[in-house]
Amino acid sequence: MAKSDGDDPLRPASPRLRSSRRHSLRYSAYTGGPDPLAPPVDLRDALEQIGQDVMAGASPRRALSELLRRGTRNLTGADRLAAEVNRRRRELLRRNNLDGTLQEIKKLLDEAVLAERKELARALDDDARFAELQLDALPVSPAKAVQELAEYRWRSGQAREKYEQIKDLLGRELLDQRFAGMKQALAGATDDDRRRVTEMLDDLNDLLDKHARGEDTQRDFDEFMTKHGEFFPENPRNVEELLDSLAKRAAAAQRFRNSLSQEQRDELDALAQQAFGSPALMRALDRLDAHLQAARPGEDWTGSQQFSGDNPFGMGEGTQALADIAELEQLAEQLSQSYPGASMDDVDLDALARQLGDQAAVDARTLAELERALVNQGFLDRGSDGQWRLSPKAMRRLGETALRDVAQQLSGRHGERDHRRAGAAGELTGATRPWQFGDTEPWHVARTLTNAVLRQAAAVHDRIRITVEDVEVAETETRTQAAVALLVDTSFSMVMENRWLPMKRTALALHHLVCTRFRSDALQIIAFGRYARTVTAAELTGLAGVYEQGTNLHHALALAGRHLRRHAGAQPVVLVVTDGEPTAHLEDFDGDGTSVFFDYPPHPRTIAHTVRGFDDMARLGAQVTIFRLGSDPGLARFIDQVARRVQGRVVVPDLDGLGAAVVGDYLRFRRR
């Protein structure tokens, strides 16, 4: 985006401004929040993934959660964001340690003593020798050495300056623990600056005293911020917000202390009394900590972390690192989405941007928008039992996707031709329309050629080239109705052999084709395992695999017969998808019974009942096609014999081609 210094980047400049500032334009990445030119959330891809998980047996709520965790082809998921969060946390602990302030104090102390020794070496008086003895007797502990040198009369100006830097450093580090950025802000500060800090702490403690007693007013807070607002870049609007920001930082400072060894704590406690040359600062901070712990007991005041790296952090840096770690742990929990009522809206986008950058926040925001869009646009419904379900709109979209995949497979078959002819499909109305996949109406040759000629009018060609976009078909008023029974095997072997999803996608594709292109046809989906039952496309989509014995094709054929008899005037079609021999049957042939007989290998009675079921389909005049999955020789023998008996067809597709085989067979029948 082009920017001109001092201009609103979203407001076009006047011609005169553009002319006078032509060479001051700068181009850079957009940084004003979410990309305004970014494409909308891809719900089609998201819904397809949710549908795959639901068909595999997950609940819609679980499928949505898994989608948000995985992400999509163009969108980072919550799991990857959480992995980045955990990686950053590990790096903070692995690369750093909390010894920085003590190391810096020891360095300044060594420099001060060395400079003083050099100065004393040039002196010849007895006082210089006595001073050397004092320096030789300094304790190894930096804290005790600093205390003993408090009354020492320095001869070297450089040494005195180094020693004063120690007290100044301690004061700035202590303040930096509670107020981020104070170490740098007070570098080279004057006595007046230090007095202003002390005055701010006194006024802050007085304000919190009044708040604890319930005597403070908004005016008290406003007056405090008017006087000391420069110390609070977070710009709190009231005392409660002020307490929130201060308590988070103070709790991190306490965790810093908890993470130190006992020796380090003792050293820093002793050194803290020398901050800014007196214990007053430490007393004010202790008073502030007491207020904050009482006001915000829910903060983590007792936690600690184990740092193991070589990079030394000072007290302020270490406190910030512990605050970052706490924020990262909170983000990891939010991104895990593993708690009751979890939602991507729970993720703190500002914190995520601070820790991982703006792109991570954009990804998380997009995931939240995706979650809301799926609900708000009607793809997920909550039932009366409180459970989420795929809505009819979602089912149509899934069916459309499944049918599109099938159409691509059918169009990619080499050496096949679709021969269409008018007749039984219906009476011509005289109107035409563009061809769509699944149409059985005859081409309107005149309109098709006209479209091809007009499309190529601007170019010179020796011949007319016809594309799919040119084709128009003649509309018809009526169409012969078909009664279609799709029998799908839902026994556990379908799950174990990875045939579950292809079977469901096949049923969805056929259901969508019938509902959109052959609305007069009556499609009934029948699922059969130990028992058979009629199911809707939505019920089949959400059907979970159950381990139970039995492939009751006999029961399924009985239900198919009922469906065909209900539509006696329609042309009957029976499509069977199965991967195993019939091993169960109903003891009541009419399909009303609940007593199931099971045996393996298939019992002759089961075979006989199933064959009679196929005979019933033949008596009804049904066109029967059986789609055999797998290479079970027993099933192959049985299916081949039954197909010859009822003059049906046997198709042996691979799993990827199952949908194309079933839909293609149905279309072949509709074109007869």
Curated annotation (Swiss-Prot):
Biased composition (Basic and acidic residues): 1-10
SUPFAM superfamilies reported in the protein's UniProt record: vWA-like
Ranges for region Disordered: 1-40
Protein name: Uncharacterized protein MT0986
Lineage, broadest ranks: Bacteria, Bacillati, Actinomycetota, Actinomycetes, Mycobacteriales
